Amino acid sequence: MLEVSGLVKRFGGFTAVNNVSFKVGLGEILGLIGPNGSGKSTIFNLLSGTLAPTAGSIRFHGREIAGRPPHQIINQGIGRTFQIPRPFRRLSLFDNVALAGYYGQGRHSHVRAYEAAERALELVGLPVDRDAPVTGLGAAGLKKLELAKALATGPSLLLADESLGGLDEAEMVQAAEMLRRIRTQLGLTIIWVEHILGVLMRVVDRVMVLDHGEKISEGLPAEVAADPRVIEVYLGTEADAVQAAARR
């Protein structure tokens, strides 16, 4: 479904992503992990069209999409959530999601956007009431809203950016299970960036690890957890958490 080859992104003299290549298969959940500053967000920005690569190829369903603007990427079928939700607080929950649906997959139809919003809100467990306000949503509700907006665009590939941030332990488990359930219900492919490794490693099919902009490991969770390079990057407690989660 997605094939990335030799991806490079430089900002002046700083190389944020250096010769990264990977593939994601249909229906797969790929976990993308690494320390702060390892290049995870930059790769998401390159995949979603927020940034253009310095070099390299991004092919989606066989089509080259590197350097295309975000609205074209969305219309190709790639949806994205953001780590920090920023809803339009003067709009209702429903209208926030319908607005995203309007631009997804070239709909440009109020009726189709409303239908997409209803489906997305039902999938994440938020009220479909057209007048329900955004104000008053807690961290878990805002994360659900962010996911609903991405789903309303009708993606076949979902880029999930730190879906567990700010949640308590029970909410983390629920959010992870929701991603797995939605993958099954919609036949989605998911790339999931996350820092909460203990939860992520129990859900994903494969893991890719970045450090200083380079891919240092890729494989099944148990394989990655045993990789000496990964253990070196995640010193101490985090390395133990990675290995423990991969054994479950």
What residue ranges belong to the model's regions?
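Glycine-rich phosphate-binding loops of nucleotide-dependent enzymes
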Residues: 1-248
